[in-house]
Regions:
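Positively charged, small/polar-rich N-terminal and surface patches that mediate targeting and assembly
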Residues: 1-116
Length: 116
């Protein structure tokens, strides 16, 4: 499956995010990845955003806990994720920090950034 992840960089610096991504790579979540920095929108405000893309055989039950961990490590309320399966079906979600107790917004594809 192909995953695309949007990580906001307002509360998080680029090199710190790359360090956590490299740690996940070293532990076998994926072999290779592509990163691009773009401008996204969060709560109506433009925010520099890391767009991470990787292919993996890991299923979503393995990837969601990784993204929840990244939320905590990268001081993110949530991280947007989209996966594309082998039949080109797509599914998007906002993965929230497990400790977040506020309103959880639904995933909205019009705000999601891709490397395509």
């Amino acid at each position: 499956m192909k995953y695309t992840i949007n990580i906001g960089l307002h509360n998080n610096n680029f090199s710190n995010a790359v360090m956590h991504i490299n740690n996940a790579k070293q532990t076998g979540y994926f072999d290779d990845y592509h990163i691009r920095e773009m401008n996204g929108i969060y709560n109506g405000v433009t925010e520099p955003t890391m767009v991470l893309t990787f292919n993996t055989k890991a299923d979503i039950t393995s990837i969601v806990p990784l993204i929840e961990k990244w939320c905590k490590q990268m001081t993110q309320v949530c991280i947007a994720m989209q996966l594309k399966d082998n039949d080109n079906n797509t599914f998007g979600a906002l993965i929230y920090d497990r400790d977040f107790r506020g309103h959880q917004s639904p995933f909205d594809n019009k705000y999601f950034l891709t490397n395509d």
